[in-house]
């Protein structure tokens, strides 16, 4: 079922939780609401559910105006971060609860309820735990039961509030794959809240990035990563290095460091250059188009990559820089703490100091043959 929000706003006293915003969610789409604490994402989810009322605007489920419809009559399933399972009920009774409290005219008979519960427990792969109690389950199992309970009434929309926030990293990853597979199999419309960038990018058809009650960007995970449209989106996604450069004599200068940009009117001014850690090359010497001297601070193998932390030498950077290398490249030419290296951006995203809300994307093919210490 499609969802349309038009000019939704919300205040709590003097605090503006949501500025007027609009959003269209397609039938069968999985949407991630992503943002830091206080961005308004949970408030927006609760307004869609009917757990909060909007101060202004309208909400449509398909062609039905549900702005003033009670949560009970919206046909939504809601999954909470803390599971909200009834401790005194068995797994089967928890799943059946929503069906048992439906109005008499709509309530299935006991045999149908039992059949539906059995089907749902098989879907979430926990049929063998039907007679256990929540305290006997792991966190991942509790979350699956909470999801089965939300699906029991056959909602047209499934809403999830940080569904994996209380789980460890390995279980979170497994449940993300499982939920995406279940969503594709059953075809319901889903909206979930998260502050985890990886979770949003892995699960969502589109990601809605929020900040201070406003929508910063709506895009597919691929487009969002490839073309962030604001400084906030860059900063929030992390793993981004920043070079603050003053425009002098055809290049950006910061202390002893400089970068010469490709010819472009948009970049011939002071501003901030963002460089992702995997789009940064390390060299044993400077070149004519970039000189960013660093000292190696730490070398940290993390899974399939090696993360090298770098401290600026002779110029100012508010934070350490990071470069991501492959294990193969690091084994070919050793790198140690305290080594002096030069970094060169391969791709950069430039924001002018004034009047530019979206970045200019720049690419440099400048390293001379043989000057690379490591290839990313």
Curated annotation (Swiss-Prot):
SUPFAM superfamilies: MOP-like, P-loop containing nucleoside triphosphate hydrolases
Bilayer-crossing regions: none
UniProt entry tagged with the keyword Cell membrane: yes
Taxonomic path: Bacteria, Pseudomonadati, Pseudomonadota, Gammaproteobacteria, Vibrionales
Organism: Vibrio cholerae serotype O1 (strain ATCC 39315 / El Tor Inaba N16961)
Complex and partners: The complex is composed of two ATP-binding proteins (CysA), two transmembrane proteins (CysT and CysW) and a solute-binding protein (CysP).
Keywords on record: ATP-binding, Cell inner membrane, Cell membrane, Membrane, Nucleotide-binding, Sulfate transport, Translocase, Transport
EC number assigned by the record: 7.3.2.3
SMART domains with a match to the protein in the record: AAA
Subcellular location field: Cell inner membrane
UniProt catalytic activity: sulfate(out) + ATP + H2O = sulfate(in) + ADP + phosphate + H(+); thiosulfate(out) + ATP + H2O = thiosulfate(in) + ADP + phosphate + H(+)
Family named by the database record: Belongs to the ABC transporter superfamily. Sulfate/tungstate importer (TC 3.A.1.6) family.
Endpoints of the signal sequence: none
Protein's name in the database: Sulfate/thiosulfate import ATP-binding protein CysA
Family matches, as PANTHER family: SPERMIDINE/PUTRESCINE IMPORT ATP-BINDING PROTEIN POTA, SPERMIDINE_PUTRESCINE IMPORT ATP-BINDING PROTEIN POTA
């Amino acid at each position: 079922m499609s969802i349309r929000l038009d000019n939704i706003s919300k205040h709590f006293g003097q605090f503006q939780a949501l500025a007027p915003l609009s959003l269209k969610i397609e039938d069968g789409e999985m949407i991630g609401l992503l943002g830091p604490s206080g961005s308004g994402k949970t408030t927006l989810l609760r307004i869609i559910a009917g757990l909060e009322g909007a101060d202004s605007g309208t909400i449509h489920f398909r062609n039905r105006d549900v702005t003033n419809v009670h949560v009970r009559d919206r046909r939504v399933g809601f999954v909470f971060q803390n599971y909200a399972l009834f401790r005194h009920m068995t797994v089967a009774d928890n799943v059946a609860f929503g069906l048992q409290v439906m109005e008499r005219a709509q309530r299935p008979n006991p045999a149908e309820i039992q059949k539906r519960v059995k089907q749902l427990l098989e879907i979430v792969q926990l049929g063998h735990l039907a007679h256990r109690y929540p305290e006997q389950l792991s966190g991942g199992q509790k979350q699956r039961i909470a999801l089965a309970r939300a699906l029991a009434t056959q909602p047209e929309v499934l809403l999830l509030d940080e569904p994996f926030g209380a789980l460890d990293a390995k279980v979170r990853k497994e449940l993300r794959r499982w939920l995406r597979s279940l969503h594709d199999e059953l075809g319901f419309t889903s909206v979930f809240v998260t502050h985890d960038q990886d979770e949003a990018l892995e699960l969502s058809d589109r990601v809605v990035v929020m900040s201070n009650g406003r929508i910063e960007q709506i895009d597919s995970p691929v487009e969002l990563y490839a073309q962030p449209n604001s400084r906030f989106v860059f900063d929030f996604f992390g793993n981004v290095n920043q070079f603050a450069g003053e425009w002098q004599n055809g290049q950006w200068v910061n202390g002893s460091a400089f970068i010469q940009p490709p010819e472009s009117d948009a970049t011939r001014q002071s501003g901030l250059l963002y460089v992702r850690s995997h789009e940064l090359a390390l060299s044993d010497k400077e070149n004519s188009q970039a000189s960013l001297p660093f000292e190696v601070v730490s070398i940290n193998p993390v899974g399939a990559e090696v993360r090298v932390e770098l401290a600026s030498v002779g110029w100012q950077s508010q934070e350490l820089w990071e470069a991501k290398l492959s294990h193969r490249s690091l084994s070919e030419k050793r790198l140690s703490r305290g080594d002096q290296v030069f970094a060169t951006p391969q791709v950069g995203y430039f924001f002018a100091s004034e009047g530019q809300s979206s970045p200019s994307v720049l690419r440099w093919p400048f390293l001379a043959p043989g000057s690379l210490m490591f290839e990313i």
